[in-house]
Amino acid sequence: TGTPRKKSGIPKKTGNPEDTAESTGAQEAKHKAGVDARIVRFLKKHHVLTLATSGEGAPYCSNAFYCYDAERNLLIFTSDMATRHAQQMARNPCVAASVVLETKVVGRVEGLQLCGKAARADEAARRAYLRRFPYAALAELTLWAIAPDFMKFTDNTLGFGKKLIWNNR
């Protein structure tokens, strides 16, 4: 929210409460793209995202099963070209998405919001998706991949409202 961030994805210390939670784990090994390992673990643990697209003068949301390719920092999902969101992505690849842990326990709240570009997925993405969802091999798939350029992970296990920011804009 207007807080300056380094291109590497490691936030600057500004004293802003929205800044990332600093802890002994904050210096843990980073993913190739500089994504904090806690974000990678969260994305790998879950499998449903809410996708936001825009077109025809209005935003639109849909849900999809996804797999996370940590090596390439891609969220891969399937969507038929006849769907409203696929048609919108084909015209405007700028998307947003969220992944949440549904819980009533405030101290366990976790959720990720991201922005990025969506494009048709390649063969490597297809293999990754089928490893996660083998039954999908029975269907004709139109796969998409989101390459995030910004992620904000809220993790109340680090303290109420603590956030980790990854920014590659």
Labelled PLM ranges:
Residues 1-6, 12-13, 17-48:
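Extreme N-terminal tail/first-helix region
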Residues 28-31, 106-169:
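Charged, gly/pro-rich active-site loop segments
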Residues 43-44, 90, 130:
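Alpha-helix boundary recognition
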Residues 45-47, 60-62, 112, 137-140:
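Short, basic and Ser/Thr-rich N-terminal targeting/leader segments
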Residues 46-81, 89, 95-100:
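Short beta-strand segments
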Residues 79-83, 96-101, 123-135:
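Short acidic (Asp/Glu) patches
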Residues 84-112, 116:
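Helix-adjacent hinge/juxtasegments
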